[in-house]
Curated annotation (Swiss-Prot):
Residues 45-64 have a biased composition (Acidic residues). It comes from Mus musculus. Transmembrane segments: none annotated. The gene is Sarnp. The modification N6-acetyllysine is found at K10, K142. This is SAP domain-containing ribonucleoprotein.
Length: 210
């Protein structure tokens, strides 16, 4: 403000009047009156400008954009690594399947008939059982069990062994003899009838059977 008063004092009367006209002030009076009017006007307007600047400053502060906070993504668990590990485990398990079981599955996939022996071998390999043919064993053990039961029943009730038990014993002996000499056909039974008759007599004498 001191600089403005100095400048006003330097102005001439005509220049002061022009300043007053420009600001809508009266031009009447001496030079000092014009200077006082201009100073009062400038002081009033200086306060208004200061207030406007303060208001504008507040508005600009309010209008300052706030920093946008980006959402922080949570770290997801490594699912891919787990999937890869499970796939590897599955591959290892499938590689340990026995060859017989794989052949059976392949035959089922392509609708190819699978033999009974291969099925048995696959089942035995699956459960860890040795695949030994049990046809001969089952056929040989059945008559023995039946004979023992018949003998026990006959001894329990004090009865003689029936002709059925004798026939089964003879059949069993014939079968064993055929297996011993490698005879397969049933025609060899005629040549061994004498031996069986002699054995029948000896057995009857031993057990006191009439």
């Amino acid at each position: 403000m001191a600089a403005e008063t100095v400048e006003l004092h330097k102005l001439k009367l005509a220049e002061l009047k022009q300043e007053c006209l420009a600001r809508g002030l009266e031009t009447k009076g001496i030079k000092q009156d014009l200077i006082n009017r201009l100073q009062a006007y400038l002081e009033d307007h200086a306060e208004e400008e200061a207030n406007e600047e303060d208001v504008l400053g507040d508005e600009t502060e309010e209008e300052e954009p706030k920093p946008i906070e980006l959402p922080v993504k949570e770290e997801e668990p490594p699912e891919k690594a787990v999937d890869m590990a499970s796939e590897k485990k599955v591959v290892k398990i499938t590689s340990g399947i026995p060859q017989t079981e794989r052949m059976q599955k392949r035959a089922e996939r392509f609708n190819v008939p699978v033999s009974l022996e291969s099925k048995k071998a696959a089942r035995a390999a699956r459960f860890g059982i040795s695949s030994v043919p049990t046809k001969g064993l089952s056929s040989d053990t059945k008559p023995m069990v039946n004979l023992d039961k018949l003998k026990e029943r006959a001894q329990r009730f004090g009865l003689n062994v029936s002709s059925i038990s004798r026939k089964s014993e003879d059949d069993e002996k014939l079968k064993k003899r055929k297996e011993r000499f490698g005879i397969v056909t049933s025609s060899a039974g005629t040549g061994t009838t004498e031996d069986t008759e002699a054995k029948k007599r000896k057995r009857a004498e031993r057990f006191g059977i009439a």
